[in-house]
């Protein structure tokens, strides 16, 4: 676990599989609190799906969970894993990417699967700190994530942090939005 105290009361920590599994209930509650609000408007099926797949994700090689706490209260999170060589991440894109771009080694690209900060804690840099900590220790050359096109504010934040859209992808239920933008960050935090 990496521990970075940001203020007297705020702490950023990165966890591996075992710690992530112990925090699963807390992370799933945070996910629901973040993604039940506009513009995401998550539903019960999405939240049940996230609770079901989080433990499976935590067991993937290279999985990382980064959390933010203010005192004892968890206020934000981000998690993901390196894309395996046989990934389907780059398939079913509306605008296909070339073979070289889509080639994965198991360490080339870190996929940010879910990421969020409680609404009353946004705008204070918490999200950026989670983002940088999660990615800087991943060992990957680049990162990718998906974001709903209607999440205009979120997309703008990612753009300011250096992410760019490479395509969009149709998602399967119970994901609430059928279409997601696929973004890539090619200059990882710590390399800037």
Give the residues covered by each predicted segment.
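Active-site rim helix/loop that mediates acceptor-substrate recognition in acyltransferases
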Residues: 41-65, 69-71, 75, 79-82
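Helix-loop element at the rim of GNAT/NAT acetyltransferase active sites that forms part
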Residues: 28-44
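Conserved acetyl-CoA-binding loop-helix of GNAT-fold acetyltransferases
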Residues: 114-119, 123-136, 156-160
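Conserved GNAT acetyl-CoA-binding A-motif
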Residues: 136-150
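Short glycine/proline-centered loop/turn elements that form peptide/ligand docking sites
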Residues: 127, 131, 150-154, 170-177
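Conserved N-terminal entry element of GNAT/NAT acetyltransferase domains
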Residues: 1-25, 29, 33
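Conserved acyl-donor/pantetheine-binding loop and adjacent beta-alpha core of acyl/acetyltransferases
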Residues: 79-116, 173-176
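Conserved catalytic-core motifs of GNAT/GCN5-like acyltransferases
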Residues: 144-146, 164-179
